[in-house]
Amino acid sequence: MNRLKEKFNTEVTENLMKKFNYSSVMEVPKIDKIVVNMGVGDAVQNSKVLDNAVEELELITGQKPLVTKAKKSIATFRLREGMPIGAKVTLRGERMYEFLDKLISVSLPRVRDFQGVSKKAFDGRGNYTLGVKEQLIFPEIDYDKVSKVRGMDIVIVTTANTDEEARELLANFGMPFRK
Protein backbone atom coordinates (compact mmCIF):
# COMPACT_ATOMS: atom_id res chain seq x y z
CA MET A 1 0.00 0.00 0.00
CA ASN A 2 1.12 3.53 -0.74
CA ARG A 3 2.79 5.57 2.02
CA LEU A 4 0.27 8.45 1.89
CA LYS A 5 -2.75 6.12 1.75
CA GLU A 6 -1.46 4.32 4.83
CA LYS A 7 -0.92 7.67 6.56
CA PHE A 8 -4.50 8.67 5.66
CA ASN A 9 -5.96 5.46 7.08
CA THR A 10 -3.99 5.68 10.34
CA GLU A 11 -3.16 9.29 11.31
CA VAL A 12 -5.08 11.71 9.07
CA THR A 13 -8.53 10.18 9.65
CA GLU A 14 -7.99 10.24 13.40
CA ASN A 15 -6.75 13.86 13.43
CA LEU A 16 -9.66 15.13 11.33
CA MET A 17 -12.22 13.19 13.42
CA LYS A 18 -10.91 14.94 16.55
CA LYS A 19 -10.62 18.40 15.02
CA PHE A 20 -14.04 18.58 13.31
CA ASN A 21 -15.97 16.26 15.72
CA TYR A 22 -17.28 13.91 13.03
CA SER A 23 -19.66 11.23 14.28
CA SER A 24 -18.69 8.71 11.60
CA VAL A 25 -15.46 7.80 9.80
CA MET A 26 -17.35 8.18 6.51
CA GLU A 27 -17.72 11.93 7.12
CA VAL A 28 -13.95 12.46 7.01
CA PRO A 29 -12.99 14.19 3.73
CA LYS A 30 -10.82 12.24 1.28
CA ILE A 31 -8.98 13.10 -1.89
CA ASP A 32 -11.26 12.16 -4.78
CA LYS A 33 -8.98 12.76 -7.77
CA ILE A 34 -6.09 14.85 -9.06
CA VAL A 35 -6.35 16.47 -12.49
CA VAL A 36 -3.11 17.58 -14.16
CA ASN A 37 -3.70 19.91 -17.11
CA MET A 38 -1.19 21.34 -19.55
CA GLY A 39 -2.40 24.02 -21.96
CA VAL A 40 -0.25 24.22 -25.07
CA GLY A 41 -1.14 27.38 -26.98
CA ASP A 42 1.76 26.90 -29.42
CA ALA A 43 0.09 23.74 -30.73
CA VAL A 44 -2.00 25.92 -33.08
CA GLN A 45 1.06 26.66 -35.26
CA ASN A 46 3.04 23.46 -34.67
CA SER A 47 1.39 20.16 -33.72
CA LYS A 48 4.77 18.58 -32.82
CA VAL A 49 4.84 20.78 -29.70
CA LEU A 50 1.74 19.01 -28.40
CA ASP A 51 3.35 15.58 -28.88
CA ASN A 52 6.24 16.65 -26.63
CA ALA A 53 3.81 17.94 -24.00
CA VAL A 54 1.83 14.68 -24.08
CA GLU A 55 5.04 12.68 -23.72
CA GLU A 56 6.22 14.77 -20.75
CA LEU A 57 2.83 14.57 -19.04
CA GLU A 58 2.86 10.78 -19.47
CA LEU A 59 6.33 10.58 -17.87
CA ILE A 60 5.26 12.77 -14.95
CA THR A 61 1.96 11.03 -14.16
CA GLY A 62 2.56 7.49 -15.41
CA GLN A 63 -0.70 7.58 -17.35
CA LYS A 64 -1.54 8.40 -20.97
CA PRO A 65 -2.97 11.93 -21.23
CA LEU A 66 -6.18 12.92 -22.98
CA VAL A 67 -5.62 15.50 -25.72
CA THR A 68 -7.99 18.44 -25.14
CA LYS A 69 -9.52 20.23 -28.11
CA ALA A 70 -10.75 23.81 -28.59
CA LYS A 71 -14.46 24.22 -27.83
CA LYS A 72 -14.86 27.43 -29.85
CA SER A 73 -13.18 29.10 -32.79
CA ILE A 74 -11.34 32.30 -31.83
CA ALA A 75 -10.09 34.28 -34.83
CA THR A 76 -7.59 36.45 -32.93
CA PHE A 77 -5.76 33.33 -31.72
CA ARG A 78 -6.04 31.65 -35.17
CA LEU A 79 -7.96 28.91 -33.45
CA ARG A 80 -10.56 26.61 -35.04
CA GLU A 81 -13.08 24.53 -33.15
CA GLY A 82 -11.78 20.99 -32.57
CA MET A 83 -8.08 21.87 -32.84
CA PRO A 84 -5.91 20.06 -30.26
CA ILE A 85 -4.63 22.69 -27.78
CA GLY A 86 -3.64 20.83 -24.62
CA ALA A 87 -3.46 17.63 -22.62
CA LYS A 88 -4.87 16.49 -19.30
CA VAL A 89 -4.65 13.49 -17.00
CA THR A 90 -7.12 12.49 -14.30
CA LEU A 91 -5.45 10.44 -11.56
CA ARG A 92 -7.45 8.30 -9.13
CA GLY A 93 -6.66 5.58 -6.62
CA GLU A 94 -3.12 4.29 -6.22
CA ARG A 95 -1.57 6.51 -8.92
CA MET A 96 -3.19 9.57 -7.36
CA TYR A 97 -1.53 8.92 -3.98
CA GLU A 98 1.80 8.18 -5.66
CA PHE A 99 1.65 11.45 -7.61
CA LEU A 100 0.68 13.48 -4.52
CA ASP A 101 3.50 11.89 -2.51
CA LYS A 102 6.00 12.71 -5.27
CA LEU A 103 4.64 16.26 -5.59
CA ILE A 104 4.87 17.02 -1.86
CA SER A 105 8.15 15.31 -1.02
CA VAL A 106 10.23 15.71 -4.19
CA SER A 107 8.86 18.16 -6.77
CA LEU A 108 7.68 21.17 -4.73
CA PRO A 109 10.95 21.46 -2.76
CA ARG A 110 12.78 21.65 -6.14
CA VAL A 111 10.93 24.86 -7.11
CA ARG A 112 13.23 27.89 -7.13
CA ASP A 113 12.76 30.29 -4.15
CA PHE A 114 10.03 28.05 -2.73
CA GLN A 115 8.30 29.44 0.35
CA GLY A 116 5.31 27.12 0.35
CA VAL A 117 2.07 26.92 -1.62
CA SER A 118 -0.67 29.56 -1.28
CA LYS A 119 -3.42 29.04 1.29
CA LYS A 120 -5.86 31.05 -0.83
CA ALA A 121 -6.07 28.72 -3.84
CA PHE A 122 -9.18 26.88 -2.59
CA ASP A 123 -12.37 27.30 -4.62
CA GLY A 124 -14.97 27.46 -1.84
CA ARG A 125 -16.03 23.82 -2.34
CA GLY A 126 -12.97 22.14 -0.86
CA ASN A 127 -10.88 21.78 -4.01
CA TYR A 128 -7.32 23.04 -4.31
CA THR A 129 -5.67 24.40 -7.45
CA LEU A 130 -1.93 24.71 -7.85
CA GLY A 131 -0.03 26.20 -10.78
CA VAL A 132 3.45 24.93 -11.61
CA LYS A 133 5.58 27.25 -13.77
CA GLU A 134 7.97 24.64 -15.15
CA GLN A 135 7.85 20.88 -15.72
CA LEU A 136 11.54 20.54 -14.78
CA ILE A 137 10.72 20.20 -11.06
CA PHE A 138 9.59 16.62 -11.66
CA PRO A 139 12.41 14.05 -11.38
CA GLU A 140 11.26 12.09 -14.48
CA ILE A 141 11.90 15.02 -16.82
CA ASP A 142 15.37 15.01 -18.35
CA TYR A 143 16.68 18.58 -18.51
CA ASP A 144 18.53 18.01 -21.81
CA LYS A 145 15.51 16.61 -23.65
CA VAL A 146 13.19 19.54 -22.84
CA SER A 147 12.39 21.61 -25.94
CA LYS A 148 10.46 24.34 -24.09
CA VAL A 149 9.75 25.07 -20.44
CA ARG A 150 6.02 24.59 -19.87
CA GLY A 151 3.82 25.02 -16.85
CA MET A 152 0.79 23.05 -15.76
CA ASP A 153 -2.25 23.24 -13.50
CA ILE A 154 -2.76 20.66 -10.78
CA VAL A 155 -6.25 20.43 -9.28
CA ILE A 156 -6.74 18.34 -6.14
CA VAL A 157 -10.43 17.45 -5.82
CA THR A 158 -11.53 16.47 -2.31
CA THR A 159 -14.82 15.36 -0.79
CA ALA A 160 -14.54 18.15 1.82
CA ASN A 161 -17.50 20.51 2.13
CA THR A 162 -15.52 23.57 3.21
CA ASP A 163 -12.13 25.04 2.39
CA GLU A 164 -11.08 24.75 6.03
CA GLU A 165 -11.64 20.97 6.02
CA ALA A 166 -9.76 20.58 2.73
CA ARG A 167 -6.86 22.73 4.00
CA GLU A 168 -6.60 20.60 7.14
CA LEU A 169 -6.71 17.40 5.06
CA LEU A 170 -3.88 18.54 2.77
CA ALA A 171 -1.85 19.92 5.70
CA ASN A 172 -2.10 16.51 7.39
CA PHE A 173 -0.73 14.94 4.21
CA GLY A 174 2.25 17.30 4.49
CA MET A 175 1.37 19.94 1.88
CA PRO A 176 3.79 22.83 2.54
CA PHE A 177 1.45 25.83 2.95
CA ARG A 178 2.88 29.34 3.34
CA LYS A 179 3.04 30.58 6.91
From Swiss-Prot:
<dbReference type="GO" id="GO:0003723">
    <property type="term" value="F:RNA binding"/>
</dbReference>
<keyword id="KW-0694">RNA-binding</keyword>
<dbReference type="Pfam" id="PF00281">
    <property type="entry name" value="Ribosomal_L5"/>
</dbReference>
<dbReference type="GO" id="GO:0003735">
    <property type="term" value="F:structural constituent of ribosome"/>
</dbReference>
<dbReference type="GO" id="GO:0019843">
    <property type="term" value="F:rRNA binding"/>
</dbReference>
<dbReference type="GO" id="GO:0006412">
    <property type="term" value="P:translation"/>
</dbReference>
<dbReference type="InterPro" id="IPR020929">
    <property type="entry name" value="Ribosomal_uL5_CS"/>
</dbReference>
<dbReference type="Pfam" id="PF00673">
    <property type="entry name" value="Ribosomal_L5_C"/>
</dbReference>
<comment type="similarity">
    <text>Belongs to the universal ribosomal protein uL5 family.</text>
</comment>
<comment type="subunit">
    <text>Part of the 50S ribosomal subunit; part of the 5S rRNA/L5/L18/L25 subcomplex. Contacts the 5S rRNA and the P site tRNA. Forms a bridge to the 30S subunit in the 70S ribosome.</text>
</comment>
<comment type="function">
    <text>This is one of the proteins that bind and probably mediate the attachment of the 5S RNA into the large ribosomal subunit, where it forms part of the central protuberance. In the 70S ribosome it contacts protein S13 of the 30S subunit (bridge B1b), connecting the 2 subunits; this bridge is implicated in subunit movement. Contacts the P site tRNA; the 5S rRNA and some of its associated proteins might help stabilize positioning of ribosome-bound tRNAs.</text>
</comment>
<keyword id="KW-0820">tRNA-binding</keyword>
<dbReference type="InterPro" id="IPR031310">
    <property type="entry name" value="Ribosomal_uL5_N"/>
</dbReference>
<dbReference type="InterPro" id="IPR020930">
    <property type="entry name" value="Ribosomal_uL5_bac-type"/>
</dbReference>
<keyword id="KW-0687">Ribonucleoprotein</keyword>
<keyword id="KW-0689">Ribosomal protein</keyword>
<dbReference type="InterPro" id="IPR031309">
    <property type="entry name" value="Ribosomal_uL5_C"/>
</dbReference>
<dbReference type="GO" id="GO:0022625">
    <property type="term" value="C:cytosolic large ribosomal subunit"/>
</dbReference>
<dbReference type="GO" id="GO:0000049">
    <property type="term" value="F:tRNA binding"/>
</dbReference>
<keyword id="KW-0699">rRNA-binding</keyword>
<protein>
    <recommendedName>
        <fullName>Large ribosomal subunit protein uL5</fullName>
    </recommendedName>
</protein>
<dbReference type="InterPro" id="IPR022803">
    <property type="entry name" value="Ribosomal_uL5_dom_sf"/>
</dbReference>
<dbReference type="InterPro" id="IPR002132">
    <property type="entry name" value="Ribosomal_uL5"/>
</dbReference>
